[in-house]
Amino acid sequence: MIVERPVTILGEPSLEAALALPPGAPLGVVLCHPHPRYGGDLDSPVVVAAAEACARQGLATLRFNFRGVGASAGAWDEGRGERDDVRAALADLRRQLAPPARVALAGYSFGASLAAAVAAGGERLAGLALIGPPLATPGWQRPGPLAIDGPLLVVAGSEDPYCPRAALAALATVMPEAIVTVIDGADHFFSAGLEALDAALADWAAKVW
């Protein structure tokens, strides 16, 4: 069972978060939740499951609420300011880790879109996991070159209408280094595939260095 404590990421705006920080941990992962306009927050089941999978591999974990969600200050910014929220969370976790203080990034659904955008924006990462990326939605933008020094995972359910196999295959052609995992029978919410998702994320987290 992951042991977390509530924290606040200071900044403009301040962000509500949950941190699990093993003593002396040099590696960590920031987790981005799904779309806040559709009820997504840091307690979304997939985000919690992802944090638990990473924590079992010894990584510090930081789940946070985007601006305007829960106790986070600010207001919805159409995905623009939310990218700054991701960067603030990455910087906050880095400050709390032991050297070399390397941080990976994982995002689910809308959170995967922002994680990919931040990785393509030059943020140096120890790994990237895109969970159920919404490839078939207008909000998805194919990322450019990614600044990643570790494993890249793309995982989706076979029954996910927002991440069809054709779009997933197209993404794999521009991310040849990615481990692409399709979970049979799982939908966008992984309601029938949380165990398989847990295994895929634990394997990814074990490769973060």
Protein language model regions, located:
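Gly/Ala-rich beta-loop-alpha elbow adjacent to hydrolase catalytic centers
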Residues: 107-115
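Acidic catalytic loop of the alpha/beta-hydrolase fold
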Residues: 136-137, 158-163, 188-189
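A conserved short beta-strand
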Residues: 124-136
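Short beta-strand/loop motif that positions the catalytic acidic residue
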Residues: 147-149, 153-156, 160
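Catalytic histidine-centered segment of alpha/beta-hydrolase-like enzymes
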Residues: 74, 186-198
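Short beta-strand immediately N-terminal to the catalytic nucleophile in serine-hydrolase-like folds
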Residues: 104-107, 131
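Catalytic histidine neighborhood in serine/cysteine hydrolases
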Residues: 173-189
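Serine-hydrolase catalytic machinery in alpha/beta-hydrolase-like enzymes
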Residues: 9, 14-98
